Amino acid sequence: MSKVCIIGTTTWGITLGTIIAHKGREVMLWARTEDEAMLLSTQRRPADFLPENYHFPEFMNVTACLEEAVAGADMVLLAVPSQRMRPNIRLVAPLLTKSMLICSAAKGLEIGTAKRMSQVITDEISPDFAKNICVLSGPNLAMEILKGLPAVTVLAADTEKTAKKAAKLITAANFSAYTNTDIIGVELGGSLKNIIALGAGIVDGLNLGNNAKSALITRGLTEISALGAALGANPLTLSGLAGLGDLIATCSSNLSRNHFVGVELTKGRSLNDIMYNMSNVAEGVSTTAVAYEMARSMDLEMPVTENIYNVLYNNADPKEAARILMDAQATHELAGRKWNLFKMFRKRKARKTPELNPD
């Protein structure tokens, strides 16, 4: 029987464990304390977990012993907040073997380094195991998946062989996995879309309508593609499941934590108050800060990100930020066959309509 070790008793970690265990594979969840492991093992569910009728499937168990959790695993799947990825992979690294896949299911960028999660993992494990790193990302709202509703995801790795091996372990009824070798694009799509989801929450909180939200999502995708291209991603990846697909799901659903934060900001609540009272992490808050600094250092114009940053960190009025975003100047909107997204978003002193590259 195949075995998957999941690091992180988060909502997403438990959801992924449930998917995998329902397929008849052994899943071992690692809990950080004996008390947590005992409680989860006894109740077979988290105390505050929804839906109410949820219980761990037969082949999913919990342990506080990291060695027991990792031993014999075909994959170690890290479903932890992005700012906790480095300390967790440091604990796991000495227990890895050359045959184990190491999969990140986190959607964020590390504060201070601006690194993607696969880069953080690479920093902390033996170079001999780097070929086994993969990432999971896509339009995956946990509560829908736990209700048995269909969803798809993307498994990305540097090689198609590794991506397919990971996808085979993850794929189950109502949860299909596509593969991709553009690990940069898949990770950036999953991370950066959370910024736009914050904006979508603001638009919804202000009751600005679907026209405004569709404009925000579309311009947000252009920003994601511009930054992604500058960092080495394939822009086509960002129009796929891990980019546009995840963007639509997160911006359209009340189940999204980042969308929730955006809505609450329009009610006059402070960011600290919102975050303090949330049981889960809204990754978009930290990702906005990282992406904002990256854009500045690369001289990339990212107006959506800049305005969301000002709302989060400079106490800008959400209503004024939305007005600025909807009051764009008449510039070229098309991305043609030979359009250079990086140059298109380079800041220009004279805001002229950019010219298409000649044939």
Swiss-Prot record:
It catalyses: sn-glycerol 3-phosphate + NAD(+) = dihydroxyacetone phosphate + NADH + H(+); sn-glycerol 3-phosphate + NADP(+) = dihydroxyacetone phosphate + NADPH + H(+). One of its GO terms (cellular component) is cytosol. It is an enzyme of class 1 (oxidoreductase). The active site is at 193 (proton acceptor). NADPH binds at residues 11-12, 32, 107, 142, 257, 281, 283. The keyword Oxidoreductase applies. Sn-glycerol 3-phosphate binds at residues 107, 138, 193, 246, 256-258. GO terms for biological process: carbohydrate metabolic process; glycerol-3-phosphate biosynthetic process; glycerol-3-phosphate catabolic process; glycerophospholipid metabolic process; phospholipid biosynthetic process. Its main location: cytoplasm. Pathway: Membrane lipid metabolism; glycerophospholipid metabolism. Keywords: Cytoplasm, Lipid biosynthesis, Lipid metabolism, NAD, NADP, Nucleotide-binding, Oxidoreductase, Phospholipid biosynthesis, Phospholipid metabolism. InterPro entries: 6-PGluconate_DH-like_C_sf, 6PGD_dom2, G3P_DH_NAD-dep, G3P_DH_NAD-dep_C, G3P_DH_NAD-dep_N, NAD(P)-bd_dom_sf. It is found in: Cytoplasm. Its EC number is 1.1.1.94. Pfam families: NAD_Gly3P_dh_C (PF07479), NAD_Gly3P_dh_N (PF01210). Catalyzes the reduction of the glycolytic intermediate dihydroxyacetone phosphate (DHAP) to sn-glycerol 3-phosphate (G3P), the key precursor for phospholipid synthesis. HAMAP family: NAD_Glyc3P_dehydrog (MF_00394). PANTHER family: GLYCEROL-3-PHOSPHATE DEHYDROGENASE (PTHR11728), GLYCEROL-3-PHOSPHATE DEHYDROGENASE [NAD(+)] 2, CHLOROPLASTIC (PTHR11728:SF1). NCBIfam families: PRK00094.1-2, PRK00094.1-4. This is Glycerol-3-phosphate dehydrogenase [NAD(P)+]. The gene is gpsA.
